[in-house]
Protein backbone atom coordinates (compact mmCIF):
# COMPACT_ATOMS: atom_id res chain seq x y z
CA UNK A 1 0.00 0.00 0.00
CA UNK A 2 1.34 3.41 -0.98
CA UNK A 3 2.14 5.51 2.09
CA UNK A 4 1.05 9.08 2.68
CA UNK A 5 3.58 11.88 2.66
CA UNK A 6 3.74 14.77 5.09
CA UNK A 7 6.14 17.26 6.63
CA UNK A 8 6.73 18.02 10.28
CA UNK A 9 9.56 18.78 12.67
CA UNK A 10 11.12 15.54 13.92
CA UNK A 11 11.22 16.05 17.68
CA UNK A 12 9.76 14.73 20.93
CA UNK A 13 7.68 17.89 21.31
CA UNK A 14 4.02 16.87 21.49
CA UNK A 15 2.71 18.88 18.55
CA UNK A 16 5.46 17.67 16.25
CA UNK A 17 5.21 14.02 17.25
CA UNK A 18 1.41 14.10 17.00
CA UNK A 19 1.58 14.36 13.21
CA UNK A 20 2.52 10.74 12.63
CA UNK A 21 0.05 9.41 15.21
CA UNK A 22 -2.90 11.47 13.95
CA UNK A 23 -2.32 10.91 10.25
CA UNK A 24 -1.77 7.16 10.55
CA UNK A 25 -4.74 6.68 12.90
CA UNK A 26 -7.09 8.60 10.62
CA UNK A 27 -5.88 7.15 7.32
CA UNK A 28 -4.85 3.61 8.34
CA UNK A 29 -1.78 4.15 6.19
CA UNK A 30 1.87 4.61 6.96
CA UNK A 31 3.09 8.19 6.68
CA UNK A 32 6.54 9.26 5.54
CA UNK A 33 8.08 12.54 6.69
CA UNK A 34 9.64 14.23 3.64
CA UNK A 35 10.45 17.53 5.32
CA UNK A 36 13.50 19.34 3.90
CA UNK A 37 14.28 20.28 7.51
CA UNK A 38 15.21 16.71 8.49
CA UNK A 39 18.81 16.04 9.44
CA UNK A 40 21.10 14.69 6.71
CA UNK A 41 20.74 10.98 7.53
CA UNK A 42 16.93 11.18 7.68
CA UNK A 43 16.82 13.13 4.40
CA UNK A 44 18.85 10.41 2.71
CA UNK A 45 16.40 7.76 3.95
CA UNK A 46 13.34 9.72 2.80
CA UNK A 47 14.78 10.80 -0.57
CA UNK A 48 13.81 7.68 -2.60
CA UNK A 49 10.31 7.78 -1.13
CA UNK A 50 9.96 11.43 -2.00
CA UNK A 51 11.04 10.71 -5.57
CA UNK A 52 8.33 8.05 -5.74
CA UNK A 53 5.83 10.60 -4.44
CA UNK A 54 6.81 13.03 -7.21
CA UNK A 55 6.53 10.35 -9.90
CA UNK A 56 3.07 9.34 -8.68
CA UNK A 57 1.89 12.92 -8.23
CA UNK A 58 1.09 12.44 -4.55
CA UNK A 59 0.61 15.51 -2.32
CA UNK A 60 2.49 16.47 0.83
CA UNK A 61 0.20 16.96 3.82
CA UNK A 62 0.89 19.86 6.17
CA UNK A 63 -1.06 19.24 9.35
CA UNK A 64 -0.14 19.93 12.99
CA UNK A 65 2.02 22.79 14.19
CA UNK A 66 3.34 26.20 13.28
CA UNK A 67 4.64 24.90 9.96
CA UNK A 68 2.31 26.60 7.49
CA UNK A 69 5.24 28.59 6.05
CA UNK A 70 6.79 25.27 4.98
CA UNK A 71 3.95 24.58 2.50
CA UNK A 72 4.71 24.65 -1.22
CA UNK A 73 2.97 23.96 -4.53
CA UNK A 74 2.71 20.23 -3.75
CA UNK A 75 1.15 20.73 -0.31
CA UNK A 76 -2.35 19.99 0.92
CA UNK A 77 -2.88 22.14 4.00
CA UNK A 78 -5.13 20.90 6.80
CA UNK A 79 -4.89 22.76 10.08
CA UNK A 80 -1.40 24.25 10.57
CA UNK A 81 -0.67 27.89 11.29
CA UNK A 82 2.09 30.45 11.12
CA UNK A 83 4.40 30.88 14.09
CA UNK A 84 4.41 34.68 13.94
CA UNK A 85 2.73 37.57 12.17
CA UNK A 86 5.87 38.03 10.07
CA UNK A 87 5.71 34.68 8.28
CA UNK A 88 4.38 34.19 4.76
CA UNK A 89 3.77 31.37 2.29
CA UNK A 90 6.57 30.96 -0.25
CA UNK A 91 4.08 30.00 -2.96
CA UNK A 92 0.46 28.97 -3.30
CA UNK A 93 -0.20 25.44 -1.99
CA UNK A 94 -1.93 22.81 -4.09
CA UNK A 95 -4.95 22.96 -1.77
CA UNK A 96 -5.84 24.68 1.48
CA UNK A 97 -8.62 22.91 3.38
CA UNK A 98 -8.26 24.49 6.83
CA UNK A 99 -5.81 26.54 8.87
CA UNK A 100 -5.34 26.85 12.61
CA UNK A 101 -7.09 30.19 12.95
CA UNK A 102 -8.26 33.49 11.42
CA UNK A 103 -4.92 35.23 11.94
CA UNK A 104 -3.14 32.69 9.74
CA UNK A 105 -5.95 32.94 7.20
CA UNK A 106 -5.64 36.73 7.09
CA UNK A 107 -1.97 36.43 6.14
CA UNK A 108 -2.80 34.01 3.33
CA UNK A 109 -5.54 36.28 2.01
CA UNK A 110 -3.17 39.26 2.14
CA UNK A 111 -0.89 37.32 -0.23
CA UNK A 112 -3.73 36.99 -2.72
CA UNK A 113 -4.26 33.25 -2.16
CA UNK A 114 -7.58 31.56 -1.48
CA UNK A 115 -8.25 30.12 1.98
CA UNK A 116 -11.59 28.76 3.21
CA UNK A 117 -13.04 29.92 6.50
CA UNK A 118 -12.44 26.55 8.13
CA UNK A 119 -10.37 26.58 11.29
CA UNK A 120 -8.89 24.37 13.97
CA UNK A 121 -5.74 22.68 15.16
CA UNK A 122 -6.05 18.99 14.16
CA UNK A 123 -4.90 18.00 17.66
CA UNK A 124 -8.43 18.98 18.73
CA UNK A 125 -9.45 15.65 17.20
CA UNK A 126 -7.03 13.60 19.29
CA UNK A 127 -9.82 12.45 21.60
CA UNK A 128 -11.43 10.81 18.56
CA UNK A 129 -8.48 8.51 17.99
CA UNK A 130 -7.60 8.04 21.67
CA UNK A 131 -10.89 8.21 23.61
CA UNK A 132 -10.33 8.49 27.34
CA UNK A 133 -12.21 9.96 30.29
CA UNK A 134 -10.71 12.33 32.89
CA UNK A 135 -9.88 10.85 36.30
CA UNK A 136 -8.75 13.91 38.30
CA UNK A 137 -6.34 13.20 41.15
CA UNK A 138 -4.47 16.53 41.02
CA UNK A 139 -6.00 19.98 41.42
CA UNK A 140 -3.80 21.39 38.68
CA UNK A 141 -1.69 20.12 35.82
CA UNK A 142 1.00 22.49 34.56
CA UNK A 143 2.25 21.80 31.03
CA UNK A 144 5.15 24.14 30.31
CA UNK A 145 6.65 24.63 26.88
CA UNK A 146 9.86 22.62 26.82
CA UNK A 147 11.88 25.85 27.09
CA UNK A 148 10.08 26.59 30.38
CA UNK A 149 10.08 23.09 31.85
CA UNK A 150 12.98 23.35 34.30
CA UNK A 151 11.75 26.69 35.62
CA UNK A 152 8.19 25.41 36.09
CA UNK A 153 9.48 22.24 37.75
CA UNK A 154 11.51 24.30 40.20
CA UNK A 155 8.54 26.51 41.06
CA UNK A 156 5.83 23.85 41.38
CA UNK A 157 7.41 20.40 41.31
CA UNK A 158 7.15 19.98 45.09
CA UNK A 159 3.46 20.95 45.27
CA UNK A 160 1.44 17.84 46.14
CA UNK A 161 -1.71 19.15 44.45
CA UNK A 162 0.15 19.94 41.21
CA UNK A 163 1.48 17.70 38.45
CA UNK A 164 4.12 19.30 36.22
CA UNK A 165 3.90 17.47 32.89
CA UNK A 166 6.81 17.15 30.46
CA UNK A 167 5.37 17.87 27.00
CA UNK A 168 8.16 15.75 25.44
CA UNK A 169 7.45 12.64 27.54
CA UNK A 170 5.41 10.80 24.91
CA UNK A 171 2.17 11.43 23.02
CA UNK A 172 -0.08 9.15 25.07
CA UNK A 173 1.75 9.68 28.35
CA UNK A 174 1.11 13.43 28.19
CA UNK A 175 -2.59 12.87 27.53
CA UNK A 176 -2.91 10.29 30.31
CA UNK A 177 -1.20 12.60 32.81
CA UNK A 178 -3.33 15.56 31.76
CA UNK A 179 -6.51 13.55 32.28
CA UNK A 180 -5.45 13.03 35.87
CA UNK A 181 -5.77 16.78 36.50
CA UNK A 182 -8.86 18.81 37.40
CA UNK A 183 -7.53 21.77 35.40
CA UNK A 184 -4.59 22.42 33.10
CA UNK A 185 -2.43 25.54 32.79
CA UNK A 186 0.07 25.61 29.95
CA UNK A 187 2.68 27.78 28.26
CA UNK A 188 2.71 25.24 25.42
CA UNK A 189 0.01 25.65 22.78
CA UNK A 190 -0.67 21.95 22.47
CA UNK A 191 -1.11 21.63 26.20
CA UNK A 192 -4.11 23.91 25.72
CA UNK A 193 -5.32 22.20 22.54
CA UNK A 194 -5.36 18.70 24.01
CA UNK A 195 -7.07 20.03 27.13
CA UNK A 196 -9.81 21.40 24.86
CA UNK A 197 -9.97 18.11 22.98
CA UNK A 198 -10.80 16.28 26.23
CA UNK A 199 -12.85 19.17 27.70
CA UNK A 200 -10.46 19.79 30.58
CA UNK A 201 -10.56 23.44 31.79
CA UNK A 202 -7.41 25.26 30.69
CA UNK A 203 -5.46 28.48 31.14
CA UNK A 204 -2.71 30.03 29.01
CA UNK A 205 0.42 30.65 31.09
CA UNK A 206 3.51 32.70 30.33
CA UNK A 207 6.69 31.84 32.22
CA UNK A 208 9.16 33.71 30.00
CA UNK A 209 9.78 35.34 26.62
CA UNK A 210 11.50 32.20 25.34
CA UNK A 211 8.50 30.86 23.38
CA UNK A 212 8.97 32.37 19.92
CA UNK A 213 6.29 34.21 17.97
CA UNK A 214 5.19 36.78 20.57
CA UNK A 215 2.01 34.84 21.31
CA UNK A 216 0.78 34.76 17.70
CA UNK A 217 -0.01 31.04 17.61
CA UNK A 218 -1.99 31.26 20.86
CA UNK A 219 -4.08 34.21 19.62
CA UNK A 220 -4.56 32.45 16.29
CA UNK A 221 -5.86 29.33 18.02
CA UNK A 222 -8.06 31.17 20.51
CA UNK A 223 -9.60 33.31 17.78
CA UNK A 224 -10.59 30.11 15.95
CA UNK A 225 -12.55 29.18 19.08
CA UNK A 226 -14.28 32.56 19.17
CA UNK A 227 -12.21 33.71 22.15
CA UNK A 228 -10.83 37.11 21.23
CA UNK A 229 -8.40 39.25 23.23
CA UNK A 230 -7.17 36.38 25.40
CA UNK A 231 -3.99 37.21 27.27
CA UNK A 232 -1.68 34.86 29.18
CA UNK A 233 -1.49 34.67 32.95
CA UNK A 234 2.02 35.82 33.81
CA UNK A 235 3.92 33.58 36.22
CA UNK A 236 6.64 35.03 38.43
CA UNK A 237 8.78 33.67 41.24
CA UNK A 238 6.06 34.77 43.66
CA UNK A 239 3.07 33.24 41.87
CA UNK A 240 1.28 30.74 44.10
CA UNK A 241 -0.81 27.78 42.99
CA UNK A 242 -3.96 29.45 44.31
CA UNK A 243 -3.18 32.49 42.13
CA UNK A 244 -3.15 30.29 39.04
CA UNK A 245 -6.33 28.46 40.08
CA UNK A 246 -8.04 31.80 40.67
CA UNK A 247 -7.29 32.93 37.12
CA UNK A 248 -9.42 30.25 35.41
CA UNK A 249 -12.61 31.39 33.70
CA UNK A 250 -15.22 29.08 32.12
CA UNK A 251 -15.24 28.70 28.35
CA UNK A 252 -17.08 26.51 25.90
CA UNK A 253 -15.43 24.26 23.37
CA UNK A 254 -16.53 25.01 19.82
CA UNK A 255 -17.76 21.56 18.78
CA UNK A 256 -19.00 22.90 15.43
CA UNK A 257 -15.44 23.90 14.59
CA UNK A 258 -14.21 20.38 15.38
CA UNK A 259 -16.92 18.85 13.21
CA UNK A 260 -16.09 21.14 10.28
CA UNK A 261 -12.39 20.39 10.62
CA UNK A 262 -13.12 16.67 10.67
CA UNK A 263 -15.39 16.93 7.63
CA UNK A 264 -12.62 18.35 5.42
CA UNK A 265 -9.85 15.98 6.56
CA UNK A 266 -8.31 14.78 3.27
CA UNK A 267 -7.09 11.37 4.45
CA UNK A 268 -9.67 10.10 6.96
CA UNK A 269 -11.20 6.64 6.66
CA UNK A 270 -13.70 4.74 8.77
CA UNK A 271 -12.69 3.09 12.01
CA UNK A 272 -10.56 5.41 14.10
CA UNK A 273 -8.17 4.31 16.81
CA UNK A 274 -4.54 3.72 17.65
Q: Model-found features: residue ranges?
A:
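Active-site anion-handling motifs in enzyme catalytic cores
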Residues: 1-274
Amino acid sequence: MLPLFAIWEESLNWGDAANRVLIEAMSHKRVVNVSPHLNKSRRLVSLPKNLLRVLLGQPIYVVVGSILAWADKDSVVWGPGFISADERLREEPKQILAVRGPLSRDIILSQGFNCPQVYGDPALLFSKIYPREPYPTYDLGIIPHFVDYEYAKRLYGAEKSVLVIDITSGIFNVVDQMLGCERVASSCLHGLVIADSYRVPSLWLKFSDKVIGRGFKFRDYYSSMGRENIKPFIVTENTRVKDILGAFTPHRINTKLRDELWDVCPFKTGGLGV
